[in-house]
């Protein structure tokens, strides 16, 4: 099987690595990729939907996999479907479950999927008036559209809430993503991520994970795209796994089918485990980053076969098995991230980190004359697998300590 992955980050490197080790795969390509991925895939320097389609057709690619959400909300899956080519990922209509917070919240309300109470606004003054009537804080303000995982403000005061709403609706904070805002109640509890494979009917949950979005230890500092993750999430018990399947995953997939936009691909449920049970914080239409870098090292089955089955509607025939182990992924980010980031510093110690048994996935790096340099905010992911979370964490940090550049930032 020939497989093509779309994307260029750590998540895509993890997907490429796992697909390259699939017994059914003989060739792996990535568009556009990054220089750190050449150990497992051929980098293809093409741009634009038509060029991607032409390449897949020319090379007789058997399966194309989307990494980032933007290509899905823009309809890449639909273009492949029109050409009769297998594509792992939802249609543009189904990708609304991530592309529009209001779509997702309205879907959950209609089909009684547990989530926080909310209101949606496009009018700034109406939103401010609603906020001024609220007595309970914190309050969660979300940009309706895509904002690279950073479009959420947890307002501790009325002043912060008003400032967040004005910034979004005036287009200053998140551009067109903030043309509509969702204001919802703050949920207390512990977060967990449950991803699943689905062909639109059958659902196969993956091992649960927990990611950490704050830039600093102690869950402090600015929100980021994700600074680390581990799997499985300790908060998730077998009982909770079943509750999540029965009350969230299954109803969501059934709801999408009833709405005329069946979901095929990876459905990601970001959860808050509250005193009243699991509640949905958000749905994503693709693999999480950095959760993927912690989840995929635990998968024992052939990833390419699972994905292809999702495109064909035959997922129920596949056996999906997982290691009885734990994984921890730590993100190494450049100085200034997430507000800005440095670039150009040399990355040293990659081979030493790999010798510890750690996996190294590249995100924001580039290669010049055989040496790697920083070229983004989140630069590298160092992942480790071990019998316990503590052992996996210690092993991952051992790998991180062997990496050096003038200004690395990490947390786990």
Label each region the model flagged.
Residues 1-92:
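ATP-binding N-terminal substructure of ATP-dependent carboxylate-amine bond-forming enzymes
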Residues 245-267, 284-355, 368:
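Active-site "cap" helix and flanking loop/linker of ATP-utilizing ligase/carboxylase catalytic domains
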Residues 4-5, 99-180, 234-250:
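Active-site nucleotide/adenylate-binding loops and adjacent lid/helix of ATP-dependent enzymes
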Residues 403-412:
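Single conserved hydrophobic/aromatic residue that forms the stacking wall/gate
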Residues 155-292:
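Internal nucleotide-binding/catalytic subdomain
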Residues 229-232, 378-386:
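Short, well-ordered beta-strand elements within core beta-sheets of diverse protein domains
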Residues 386-400:
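Short, well-ordered alpha-helical segments
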């Amino acid at each position: 099987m020939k497989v093509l992955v779309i994307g260029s980050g750590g998540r895509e490197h993890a997907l490429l690595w796992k697909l390259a080790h699939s017994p059914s795969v003989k060739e792996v390509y990535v568009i556009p990729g990054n220089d750190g991925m050449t150990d497992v895939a051929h980098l293809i320097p093409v741009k634009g939907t038509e060029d991607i389609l032409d390449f897949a057709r020319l090379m007789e690619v058997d399966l194309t996999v989307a990494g980032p959400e933007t290509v899905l909300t823009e309809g890449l899956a639909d273009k492949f479907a029109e050409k009769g080519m297998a594509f792992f990922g939802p249609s543009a209509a189904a990708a609304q479950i991530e592309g529009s917070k209001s779509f997702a919240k309205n879907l959950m309300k209609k089909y009684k999927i547990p989530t926080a109470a909310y209101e949606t606004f496009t009018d700034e003054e109406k939103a401010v008036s609603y906020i001024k009537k609220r007595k309970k804080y914190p309050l969660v303000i979300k940009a309706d559209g895509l904002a690279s995982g950073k479009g959420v403000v947890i307002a501790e005061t009325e002043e912060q809430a008003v400032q967040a709403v004005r910034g979004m609706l005036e287009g200053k904070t998140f551009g067109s993503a903030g043309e509509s805002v969702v204001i919802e109640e703050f949920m207390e509890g512990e977060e967990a991520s449950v991803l699943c494979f689905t062909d639109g009917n059958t659902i196969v949950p993956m091992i649960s994970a927990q990611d950490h979005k704050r830039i600093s230890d102690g869950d402090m500092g600015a929100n980021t795209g994700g600074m680390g993750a581990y799997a499985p999430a300790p908060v998730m018990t077998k009982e909770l796994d079943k509750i999540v399947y029965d009350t969230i995953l299954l109803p969501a997939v059934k709801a999408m089918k009833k709405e005329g936009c069946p979901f095929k691909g990876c459905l990601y449920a970001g959860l808050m485990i509250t005193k009243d049970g699991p509640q949905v914080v958000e749905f994503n239409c693709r693999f999480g980053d950095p959760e993927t870098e912690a989840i995929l090292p635990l998968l024992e089955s052939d990833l390419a076969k699972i994905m292809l089955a999702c495109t064909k509607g035959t997922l129920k025939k596949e056996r999906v098995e997982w290691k009885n182990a734990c994984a921890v992924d730590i993100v190494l980010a450049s100085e200034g991230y997430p507000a800005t980031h440095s670039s150009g510093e040399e990355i040293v110690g990659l081979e030493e980190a790999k010798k510890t048994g750690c996996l190294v996935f590249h995100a924001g790096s580039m290669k010049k004359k055989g040496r790697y340099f920083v070229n983004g905010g989140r630069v590298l992911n160092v992942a480790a697998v071990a019998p316990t979370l503590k052992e996996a964490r210690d092993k991952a940090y051992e790998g991180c300590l062997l990496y050096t550049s003038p200004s690395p930032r990490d947390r786990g």
